[in-house]
């Protein structure tokens, strides 16, 4: 359904460090910067990208919005969460763990305040 997701960030260096670490914990390669100062994480199934807002205003997290990534195991989900905390992220929602008997979730806010999570289907 999606070709790409692009998040607004305020500090590209801090955000790239955060996403290189968290997406690296999920098995993805570090992001690649383009000539316009945007950062791209490309996969065969889609693109995740970071950009400083073009209008010059501060990037803000979407109120009520969350971007979710898949984790192959609960251990990978926990490693993702820890990598985020160690690289400028903050925890949000409940601690990482099962939600009912169907999924395992972990939530973070990135350095720009965007809410992201990983989901592992149990």
Label the predicted regions.
Residues 1, 60-64, 100:
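Short glycine-enriched loop/turn motifs at secondary-structure junctions
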Residues 1-16, 67, 122:
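N-terminal beta-strand motif that seeds the catalytic metal site of vicinal oxygen chelate
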Residues 6, 51, 68-70, 94-95, ...:
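A cross-family glycoside hydrolase active-site/sugar-binding cleft signature
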Residues 7-48:
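Core segments of cupin and vicinal oxygen chelate
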Residues 41-85:
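Long, continuous compositionally biased terminal/linker segments
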Residues 82-122:
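Vicinal oxygen chelate
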């Amino acid at each position: 359904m999606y070709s790409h997701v692009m998040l607004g960030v305020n500090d590209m260096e801090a955000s790239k460090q955060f996403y290189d670490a968290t997406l690296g914990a999920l098995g993805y390669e570090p992001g690649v910067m383009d000539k316009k100062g945007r950062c791209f994480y490309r996969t065969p199934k889609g693109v995740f990208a970071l950009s400083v807002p073009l209008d010059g205003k501060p990037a803000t997290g979407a109120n009520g919005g969350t971007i979710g990534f898949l984790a192959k195991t609960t251990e990978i989900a926990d490693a993702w969460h820890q990598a985020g905390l160690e690289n400028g992220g903050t925890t949000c929602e409940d601690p990482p763990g099962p939600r009912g008997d169907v999924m395992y979730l972990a939530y973070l806010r990135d350095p720009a305040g965007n809410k992201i999570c990983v989901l592992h289907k149990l």
